[in-house]
Amino acid sequence: LTEDEILRLKSQSCLADDWGKVTVAEEFSTEFVHHTRFSGEVCLGVFHSEFMLPGGIRKHSGLRHVTLHNVTVGDNCCIENIQNYIANYEIGHDTFIENVDIILVDGVSKFGNGVEVSVLNETGGREVLINDKLSAHQAYILALYRHRPELIARMKEITDFYSNKHASAVGSIGNHVMILNTGSIKNVRIGDYCRICGTCRLYNGSINSNEVAPVHIGHGVICDDFIISTGSHVDDGAMLSRCFVGQACKLGHNYSASDSLFFSNCQGENGEACAIFAGPYTVTHHKSTLLIAGMFSFMNAGSGSNQSNHMYKLGPIHQGTLERGAKTTSDSYILWPARVGAFSLVMGRHVNHSDTSNLPFSYLIEQNNTTYLVPGVNLRSVGTIRDAQKWPKRDGRTDPNKLDYINYNLLSPYTVQKMFKGRETLQNLRHASGELSDIYSFHSAKIRNSALVKGIRFYEIAIHKFLGNSVIKRLEGIDFRSNEEIRARLKPDTAIGSGEWGDISGLIAPKSEIDALIDGIESGKVNRLKSINAEFEKMHSNYYTYEWTWAYEKLEEFYGIRPEGMTAEDVIHIVEKWKEAVVGLDRMVYEDAKKEFSLASMTGFGADGSRLEKELDFEQVRGDFESNPFVMAVLKHIEVKTALGDELIGRMQRVSEN
C-alpha cells in the first residue's frame, strides 16, 4: 500500500493493527473499501466487477463493514456486514459474502475428515472414519468386516494419512461462492459455486461443491462434524451431527440425523435417522419415520416405519439389514436384529428376528404377531419393475467424478444366487414337512403351502429369465457355422466371477474380487483412498464379463447341460424356456398393473355423480389402462423380447441344419 492509499483508506473509516502487513494486487483501488478493519496478514485482490442481485439491485464488489484477520481475498469479491469477523481464510474470486455473524478457523482443523461416525451400532464398534473421498463400498467394508482387524487398522491408517495431509490452520472459501444471512461458520472448508443462505451453524466440516455440481445449504440448517459431497442440497432446518452426505443427496424439512452415512441420491425429509448406513437411493419422506441402526439401499420407507435397536437390557446394541430394494409400508416395525432379503416388502410388526436373506423378492406380512413369508411374489409386482426403471432416471449426479459405483440390475448373480438357495430351501422344507402341510416354518417365519409352491415357481421363472438373458447377450450379433463356434463363444473370458457374489452397498461384484482388494489393503499394496476407489471402479466396469463366468457355470446346474458340449439345439431349448419366462412374467406384471384400474381403485372418484361420471373422472385424472405409458412399455417389452429370442433361435436353427 502507498502512503496515499493508506490515507484514503483511513478517511473511509478503515483501521489496521499494522498497515505494513496489508498487501494488495497491482490494480487495487481504495474506492470500494469502507469501514474495514485489518489485523494479521491480509492480502486483497482487485474490485472491478458488480454483482446483479434478485430484484434488480446491483452491488459493486468491495469490502464494507468487515473485520479481516489473516485473510486472503481474491479478485472481485463483495464482503459486507460481517457482525464479528472473518479469521484465517483464503477466499477465492467472484465470491459474495453478506450479513454473516462470524467465519473463522480456530487452530489446525481437518475440516470433518477423520471424524468417527458410530454407524449401525450406537455404542460403537463399527465406526466409519469419514473423508472427502468416502464411497459407499469403502464404508461398507469398514463398517462390516470387523472380523478382519488388520484390514480395519489399515483402512483407518489410510484415512488418517489423508486427513492429516489436508489439515490446515487456514480454511478456504472457493470461487463464485455465495454466503448470505448466515450465523456462525467455524472450521469449514467451502468449495466453488456453493450457496449458503440463511444457515444457522456450520462447524467442523467440508462442503465439496464445484462448478458442475454445486452444493446448496439452506435456511435453518445446523451441521456439526460433517462432510457434504458434490451436488447435494441440505435445506430447511435439517440438523446433522457426525454425518457424511454423498453426491446428489437431498435432506430437508427439519430432517434430523446423527452418526449416519448417506450415499448417492438419498433423500431424507421430516423424519429422523440415527446410526444408519443409507446406501444409494435410501428415501424417507415422512415425519413419523425413524430409521435407526440399519443398513439400507434402494429403499423406500413408509410413514411411521421404525425399528428398535434396544431391548432395555444392555443398551442400544442391535442392528439390522434391509438388503437392496426392500420397502416398508406405513406403520411397519422391525425389532432388530433381523435381515430382510433383497426387493422384499415389509408390512406390519415383526418381532421374531427373522433372516430372509436367501428368499429375495418376498412379502413379509404380520398376522397376530406372527411373521408370514410369501416368497418370490414381488417378482411379478408392477411396483418392482417400476422401481428398477426409475432409479437410473433419478440419478441426480452431475459431477463426472463419481464416488459410488451403482449397479441397477434387478437380476444379477447376487440376487439369482439367492434364488437358487431360496428354491432349494423351499424344496427342502416341502420334503421335510411333507407336501400336504398347511404351513411350513422357516427362521421364525411361517410360509403357507400355496405360497411355497408359487415361490418355487417364481424363482424358477426368474432363473430362466436371467440365464437366458445371459446366453442371448453372449451370442448376440454373430453368425455361427458350427456347434464348435458356439462353444468357443460361450467359453468365459476370465475365471473371475465364479462362486459367491456380494452387494457392497450398490456395487455388485464377485466375493473373490472383494477379498483380493481386502488382501491388498492388508498387505499394504493398496494404500491410498484413490487406489481403493479405482479397484471398485474396475470391478464395476468388468461386471458383465464376470457375470457371464458365473452364469456359464450355472447352466449345467440348472439345465443339466454341460456347457462344454453344448449344441445349437441346447441353445434353442434355453431360449424357448427364456421366452416362456419373460412373457409369463410380463403377463403377470400386466395383470398386476390392471388392478390399479379396477372398479375398487375408482372409489372416491366422480364425487357427487353417477357411475358413468366416476369412470369419466377417473379417466381424466389417471388415463385409461391401455394407453398408460407403463402398460404400453410392458406390452412393448413382450414384443421386443419375443423378437430377440426368435432371432437367436433362427440363427441356431441354421447351425443345426448344417
Tell me what each language-model feature is.
Residues 84-85, 89-91, 95-96, 101-111, ...:
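Long, charge-dense tracts
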Residues 56-64, 159-180:
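Right-handed parallel beta-helix
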Residues 10-16, 24-47, 51-63, 72, ...:
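Glycine-rich hexapeptide-repeat left-handed beta-helix
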Residues 100, 106, 367-658:
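Long, compositionally biased intrinsically disordered regions
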